[in-house]
Amino acid sequence: MNKILISILVTAFLVISNLATSTTVLAGDPGPPKEKEWKGKGEKIEFQSMPILTIKDFLNGVVPEKRNTIWGTLNFPANAPDKNVPVVVLLHGMGGIHESAEFWLSALKSMGLATFMVDSNWGRKKCKKDSNLKKDIKWCAAANRGMNRVIDGYVALELLSNHPRIDPKRIGCLGNSLGARGCLYLNVKRFQNMWGTP
């Protein structure tokens, strides 16, 4: 009987402390960590993508006149052939590129896959100055819950499909957090028609 009572008390304590911790963290949420430009190994390739859009403009396919220059870093395994190399596009979450991305870059490289790490945040870090979204968003990286990742993904796919060393039939996408949403939504036909390249 004592073991059951102790189990109930321990479980109740863990549940209550977990709820209290979550509330504290959410109440004092400072936002994403301070942004810094990621300088990974490989060839830095700049490309044009969309600025931060309102969710309404994204869903309606409204293309703004202005573009943002963002970039990705293309890295080939040491033993990669001169052509037909498969590649994985990596899309990060709201907080930018972290250690988990480094793990995936290393793991994919060890499997003989090239990687293209897209930095969606750094080129848009001044979105509050450059747009009319100042009142709508607290952090640039959080705007639209990462829907710009979808557009970045399409542009990256087009860019890589024309690269002389990449096999255009073997391009994948791997993302974490908002980047995972970006990879998932690349498959949505509606978004392909609005933002992808036919």
Where are these regions (language model features)?
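Short beta-strand element of the alpha/beta-hydrolase
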Residues: 83-93
